[in-house]
């Protein structure tokens, strides 16, 4: 009797909710080819952990205090990553292996805890920590103190334009190519690119290196570097969307060359999802969600410049580019999870990686404000309000343009995940949300046995276009 009272049969909504959230937070591997790499090894890891800790505890020389602290920190990070592999969720991706994305999530949690720790230090303690990491930072200077910006903008020569194509210009180009691969929307990418240039104008009174000549900002940044990167990233997206994804097992490949090729392809997406951030039937909640996405994206970019300005290190320092690479790694699953939450009517909560990324963005901003009070005391509130209004206006224009384009040129057949109801059924659920952003949805099966040959061929070319629940959310 007690068991009957304590148990509860899951409703259809509960099944839908758990299934859709699991697909973005705990994606399962559908095409296991070598069982050894996906079988649990908890006892092996436990034995390795105990033996290695015993070895380091009783054999290493502990006479150097600084060396003890440094190696202790590295050991804590290493074993925390082991716990991450054992306990943390896969996230939306499983290529090349779920353990990699568990460690990425573990590193993001460590970075979040580190930012919390920084909030309880004073500025001198933070600087001492930086000097301990790199003694050369004692002699670092701000770029704004040794360089001039937006000087002689009326002098436009070919030599001067070419001189601006440095390593940072190529960094902008490849950075925007990667952003396009993550966002997969010309409209949003161009809106973020233009909005960022407006952000530089509104925060120029705080960061002098935001000052640029008009031709540098419009031609070199927006059109060439950002625009070229967006174009390249979207070309790759379109190529991956048109591919047919069918993965053969290692056991079915009998040649050495074939096995090597399959091993290399393990580092490529298992499938590719067609992404549509906005459509004519979207509600105001979707508009507000995309606006929040734009604000957090701009905030994360701003943190990059405020951190190196307040704590004084160059853009070429590992603290700068290392953070950029790290943020890029955790952005990939974050965007995928946020897109699913925003567009899937059955997904009622954000993924854990998305949650941690949001906290990191705001914590970085809080750290900047806490330790840069002298800088932020010069803030013009009017500029900040105008910046928020400009972001809202450009976001509205972007979404209006996307709706207009969808109404006039964007007609296409709906996939299962774009049906009105979005409810769970044994046949539809296999299609409904397996799509992941550059990740792990398996090719969908055909829905009808009496379709024509041309329809089957069209479906084969759109196998990877299953999106995760674009509904009326």
From Swiss-Prot:
Q: On the Lumenal side, which residues?
A: 57-72, 124-186, 238-286, 343-355, 405-473
Entry-linked InterPro entries:
PSS (IPR004277)
Supply the Pfam families for this chain.
PSS
Q: Which GO terms describe its molecular function?
A: L-serine-phosphatidylcholine phosphatidyltransferase activity; L-serine-phosphatidylethanolamine phosphatidyltransferase activity
In Swiss-Prot or TrEMBL terms, this protein is called Phosphatidylserine synthase 1
List all membrane-crossing ranges: 36-56, 73-93, 103-123, 187-207, 217-237, 287-307, 320-342, 356-376, 384-404
| Record GO biological process | phosphatidylserine biosynthetic process
Q: Which gene encodes it?
A: Ptdss1
Into which family does the record put it?
A: Belongs to the phosphatidyl serine synthase family.
Q: What is its EC number?
A: 2.7.8.29
Classification lineage: Eukaryota, Metazoa, Chordata, Craniata, Vertebrata
Give the metabolic or biological pathway.
Answer: Phospholipid metabolism; phosphatidylserine biosynthesis
* One cellular-component annotation, GO: membrane
Keywords recorded for this protein, A-Z: Acetylation, Endoplasmic reticulum, Lipid biosynthesis, Lipid metabolism, Membrane, Phospholipid biosynthesis, Phospholipid metabolism, Phosphoprotein, Transferase, Transmembrane, Transmembrane helix
């Amino acid at each position: 009797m007690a068991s009957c009272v304590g148990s509860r049969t899951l409703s259809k909504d509960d099944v839908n909710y758990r299934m859709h959230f699991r697909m973005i937070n705990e994606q399962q591997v559908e095409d296991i080819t070598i069982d050894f790499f996906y079988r649990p090894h908890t006892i092996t890891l436990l034995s390795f952990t105990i033996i290695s800790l015993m070895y380091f505890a009783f054999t290493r020389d502990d006479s150097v205090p600084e060396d003890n602290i440094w190696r202790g920190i590295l050991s804590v990070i290493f074993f925390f990553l082991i716990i991450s592999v054992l306990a943390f969720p896969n996230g939306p991706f499983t290529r090349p292996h779920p353990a990699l994305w568990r460690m990425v999530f573990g590193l993001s949690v460590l970075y979040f805890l580190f930012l919390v720790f920084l909030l309880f230090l004073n500025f001198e303690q933070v600087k001492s920590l930086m000097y301990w990491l790199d003694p050369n930072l004692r002699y670092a200077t701000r770029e704004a103190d040794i360089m001039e910006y937006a000087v002689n903008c009326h002098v436009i020569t070919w030599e001067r334009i070419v001189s601006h194509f440095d390593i940072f210009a190529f960094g902008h180009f490849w950075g925007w190519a990667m952003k396009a691969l993550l966002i997969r929307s010309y409209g949003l990418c161009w809106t973020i690119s233009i909005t960022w240039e407006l952000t530089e104008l509104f925060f120029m009174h705080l960061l002098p290196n935001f000052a640029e000549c008009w031709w540098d900002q419009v031609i070199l940044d927006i059109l060439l570097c950002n625009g070229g990167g967006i174009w390249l990233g979207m070309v790759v997206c379109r190529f991956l969307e048109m591919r047919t994804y069918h993965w053969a097992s290692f056991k079915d490949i009998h040649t050495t060359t074939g096995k090597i090729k399959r091993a290399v392809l393990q580092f490529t997406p298992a499938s590719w999802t067609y992404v549509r951030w906005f459509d004519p039937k979207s509600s105001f909640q979707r508009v507000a969600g995309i606006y929040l996405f734009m604000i957090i994206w701009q905030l994360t970019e701003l943190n990059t410049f405020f951190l190196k300005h307040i704590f004084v290190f160059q853009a070429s320092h590992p603290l700068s580019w290392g953070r950029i690479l790290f943020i890029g790694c955790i952005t990939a699953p974050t965007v995928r999870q946020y897109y699913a939450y925003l567009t899937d009517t059955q997904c009622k909560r954000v993924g854990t990686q998305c949650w941690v990324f949001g906290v990191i963005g705001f914590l970085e901003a809080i750290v900047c404000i806490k330790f840069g009070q002298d800088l932020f005391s010069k803030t013009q509130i009017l500029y900040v309000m105008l910046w928020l209004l400009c972001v809202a206006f450009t976001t509205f224009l972007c979404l209006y343009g996307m709706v207009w384009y969808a109404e006039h040129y964007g007609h296409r057949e709906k996939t299962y995940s774009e049906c009105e109801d979005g409810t769970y059924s044994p046949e539809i659920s296999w299609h409904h949300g397996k799509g992941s952003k550059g990740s792990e949805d398996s090719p969908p099966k055909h829905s009808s046995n009496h379709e024509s040959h041309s329809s089957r061929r069209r479906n084969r070319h759109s196998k990877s276009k299953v999106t995760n629940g674009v509904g009326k959310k």
